[in-house]
């Protein structure tokens, strides 16, 4: 299962200020609601606008994920920002990664940071290419990481070359 979308995680303090969590004064307490992904039509509810009664809001929370049977799912890849974040407790992190494990997923690829769309696309393309060549998930992912590092290094070099003659020198 591969989802390329927008991920979110808010601390309880941050959630108090967000439109979506203001729908109920108790939503911001639940870490399973403060972590999730936004799917089709989710922007409407995300901005605090009302949705028709009985309609899905397009926001898939960690709580909802944990209630889905994904026991036949070997790998979930979330090409989305900050999907591995969650509330930290003595027994681990409470967020989407725990929810996918509770749902039965064997392996998960998530991000702790904001992700660049182009770099993410290229990295995932390389990852799946390596998987189809018969490599295991770990080796394919490591190869994709090395590929994207090389790609990024080349991009930085190209930018330096492009602008090197335009940067003024400082005279002392």
Predicted regions span which residues?
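Catalytic cores of enzymes
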Residues: 1-172
């Amino acid at each position: 299962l591969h989802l390329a979308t927008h991920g979110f995680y808010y601390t309880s303090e941050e959630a108090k200020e967000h439109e979506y969590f203001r729908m109920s004064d108790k939503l911001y307490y639940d870490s399973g609601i403060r972590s999730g992904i936004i799917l089709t039509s989710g922007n409407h509810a995300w901005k605090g606008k009302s949705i028709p009664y009985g309609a899905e809001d397009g926001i898939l929370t960690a709580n909802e994920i944990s209630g889905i049977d994904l026991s036949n799912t070997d790998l979930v890849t979330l090409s989305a920002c900050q999907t591995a974040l969650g509330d930290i407790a003595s027994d681990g992190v409470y967020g989407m990664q725990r929810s996918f494990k509770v749902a039965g997923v064997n392996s998960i690829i998530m991000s702790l940071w904001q992700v660049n769309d182009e770099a993410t696309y290229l990295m995932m393309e390389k990852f799946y290419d390596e998987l189809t060549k018969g490599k295991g998930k770990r080796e394919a992912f490591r190869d994709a990481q090395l590929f994207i590092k090389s790609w990024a290094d080349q991009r930085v070099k190209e930018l330096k070359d492009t602008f090197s003659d335009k940067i003024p020198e400082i005279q002392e």
